[in-house]
């Protein structure tokens, strides 16, 4: 019997090293042929990289992280070039090891106490009007990092009184009530938590997470803050059926969620879960119609849509594909 790997604190485990640490073996035993990307999945990069370099420089200066970089988002160039970014707080090492995600796994270090102030100043320097704050999972913290979210919201608003804040939170597994209490006095303008996939695929896609728990988190926040919109995102192309996605949409509506993102899953590397199917744009269009019929007030559905992709436009109800 092999000995468990002893992880060093602060060390990032990625790709094959990260996958080897997953207790539930989700990866196929036989090598599957990698699907070729269809034409609609090809990205046109911006001609100028000046704004991209400016944003990266501002983050490096204050030792901040963006999920855009840490998760290898395909929209990084477009979003950075438009002066938008999703900040990732509480470090860049996640205590979970989901096989779809490119964020590093490991034993994270203690959260930086000055991060909320640094984040607020960086946002002011960047002259942002809408900001998305997300984090890694921090199962090592008593409140899952919720107080840190609240501190960031407070500091950001003090320096940027006109700003709108969207938080994309983890599931706060085992500490939901404590987390919601911590965030109660400084809630965001939009509360986002992703279901990611259909419940049948949770063991494969989100080991350690629970579908109903995530739904309950969205519902409980909404009950405490009825005027704050709740939002969730789902990936497609992991082996789900269209019918399963429709059922997920119904579950979200039944738990008070009014904002939705649906996008195509892209494997960050050959070590991650493979893409089972590239969903055609027409199918995303069909699901958007269904979502609006179910009562979602905002539904961004398309191959390149991500939770925070043009989140400011999503919040305004503008078309995002």
Curated annotation (Swiss-Prot):
The keyword Membrane does not apply. The gene is lipA. Pathway: Protein modification; protein lipoylation via endogenous pathway; protein N(6)-(lipoyl)lysine from octanoyl-[acyl-carrier-protein]: step 2/2. It catalyses: [[Fe-S] cluster scaffold protein carrying a second [4Fe-4S](2+) cluster] + N(6)-octanoyl-L-lysyl-[protein] + 2 oxidized [2Fe-2S]-[ferredoxin] + 2 S-adenosyl-L-methionine + 4 H(+) = [[Fe-S] cluster scaffold protein] + N(6)-[(R)-dihydrolipoyl]-L-lysyl-[protein] + 4 Fe(3+) + 2 hydrogen sulfide + 2 5'-deoxyadenosine + 2 L-methionine + 2 reduced [2Fe-2S]-[ferredoxin]. It is an enzyme of class 2 (transferase). [4Fe-4S] cluster 1 binds at residues 68, 73, 79, 308. SMART domains: Elp3. Its cofactor is [4Fe-4S] cluster. PROSITE patterns: RADICAL_SAM. GO terms for cellular component: cytoplasm. It comes from the Bacteria. Binds 2 [4Fe-4S] clusters per subunit. One cluster is coordinated with 3 cysteines and an exchangeable S-adenosyl-L-methionine. [4Fe-4S] cluster 2 binds at residues 94, 98, 101. Its EC number is 2.8.1.8. NCBIfam families: lipA (TIGR00510), PRK05481.1 (NF004019), PRK12928.1 (NF009544). GO terms for molecular function: 4 iron, 4 sulfur cluster binding; lipoate synthase activity; metal ion binding. Residues 80-297 form the Radical SAM core domain. Its main location: cytoplasm. It holds the Pfam family LIAS_N. This is Lipoyl synthase. Belongs to the radical SAM superfamily. Lipoyl synthase family. Keywords: 4Fe-4S, Cytoplasm, Iron, Iron-sulfur, Metal-binding, S-adenosyl-L-methionine, Transferase. It is found in: Cytoplasm.
């Amino acid at each position: 019997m092999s000995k468990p790997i002893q992880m060093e604190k602060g060390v990032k485990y990625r790709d094959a090293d990260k996958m080897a640490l997953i207790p539930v073996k989700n990866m196929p035993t036989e090598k599957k042929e990698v699907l070729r990307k269809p034409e609609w999945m090809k990205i046109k990069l911006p001609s100028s990289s000046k704004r991209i370099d400016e944003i990266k420089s501002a983050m490096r200066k204050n030792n901040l992280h963006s999920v855009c970089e840490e998760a290898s988002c395909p929209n990084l160039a477009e979003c950075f070039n438009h002066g938008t970014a999703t900040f990732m707080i509480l470090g860049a090492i996640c205590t979970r090891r989901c096989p779809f995600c490119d964020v590093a796994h490991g034993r994270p270090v203690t959260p930086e106490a000055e991060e909320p102030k640094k984040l607020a100043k960086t946002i002011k320097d960047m002259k942002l009007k809408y900001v998305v704050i997300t984090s890694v999972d921090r199962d090592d913290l008593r409140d899952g990092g919720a107080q840190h979210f609240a501190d960031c919201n407070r500091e950001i608003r003090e320096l940027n009184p006109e700003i709108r804040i969207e938080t994309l939170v983890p599931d706060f597994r085992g500490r939901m009530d404590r987390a919601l209490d911590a965030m109660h006095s400084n809630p965001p303008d939009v509360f986002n938590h992703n279901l990611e996939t259909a419940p049948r695929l949770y063991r494969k896609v989100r080991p350690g997470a629970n579908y109903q728990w995530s739904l309950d988190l969205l519902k409980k926040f909404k009950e405490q803050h009825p005027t704050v919109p709740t939002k969730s995102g789902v990936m497609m192309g992991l082996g789900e059926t269209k019918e399963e996605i429709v059922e997920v949409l119904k579950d979200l509506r039944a738990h008070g969620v009014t904002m939705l993102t649906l996008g195509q899953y892209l494997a960050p590397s050959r070590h991650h879960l493979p893409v089972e199917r590239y969903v055609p744009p027409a199918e995303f269009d069909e699901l958007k119609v269904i979502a609006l019929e179910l009562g979602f007030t905002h539904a961004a559905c398309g191959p390149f849509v991500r939770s925070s992709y043009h989140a400011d436009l999503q919040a305004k109800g503008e078309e995002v594909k």
